[in-house]
Amino acid sequence: DNTRITAKWIESELGEENIGYRSRVTFIGDKGKDYRIIEVESPGESLAEEVLLVVSNFSSPDSSPGANYNASSVSMFLGLARYFVNTKNARTIRFVACPSRFPDPDSGSILSTSYIAEKCKREKEKLVGVVEIGSLGFFSEEPNSQSFPNNFDIDFPTTANFIALIGSQSSHQSMNSFISGFTKSSNIPVQKVSLNDEEISAFDGLSVFTEKGYPVIRVSDTG
């Protein structure tokens, strides 16, 4: 189906004949080889055992065409992978592309990010941070173009001309580092959203990492 086709395309784009990485593929799902998680790395040097994880999911819900959901995430993901290929960095940067969920015979479906977080914890990897790339395709200077669910007490601007960083309170330092670097090269405003444990639980893709003790932030257009 389209999810498998997309996974193969991303694997090809990241590969040695295109961007230049050697891809590592994990097959997941109740039939063994139904869904793919694609990983590539830019190896670190002095602190190579410390890993910054950059995650994008490439599947869309049935109610949302891909261009309206995560096509922008995949585009940013590939752009970052291309930027960092063959660069020298103290820490290892690992790029992971995955479907949002994959089928499980016991629970019905499992979040791919949950699988990734469990694997990192099991293998005792030293994740210094996780960046989850959300949708980034919307930008507007129109008044009242930004809204947010009423059950969150977040004071967002009403004009959707900014990048949102959403994370747990334990990700405070990671978000500040991101903002410091981003604002040196871009004039786009950045809104920092620090959520408590109860609020972060509403964001499945984030909470699976915070529950394992990993600092995580989501980069998004409107949150």
Where are these regions (language model features)?
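Surface-exposed patches in mature extracellular/periplasmic domains of secreted proteins
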Residues: N2-R4, Y21-G29, N89-I93, I188-E199
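Soluble extramembrane regions of membrane proteins in the secretory/endomembrane system
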Residues: E11, E39, E50, P143, ...
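Active-site-adjacent substrate-binding region
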Residues: L136-G223
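Structural recognition of the beta-strand scaffold that forms the well-ordered cores
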Residues: E39, V51-V55, R94-A97, V128-G134, ...
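Acidic/histidine-rich catalytic neighborhood of metal-dependent amide-processing enzymes
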Residues: D34, P61-Q173
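Sec-exported extracytoplasmic/periplasmic mature domains
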Residues: E11, G15-G20, A81-N89, R101, ...
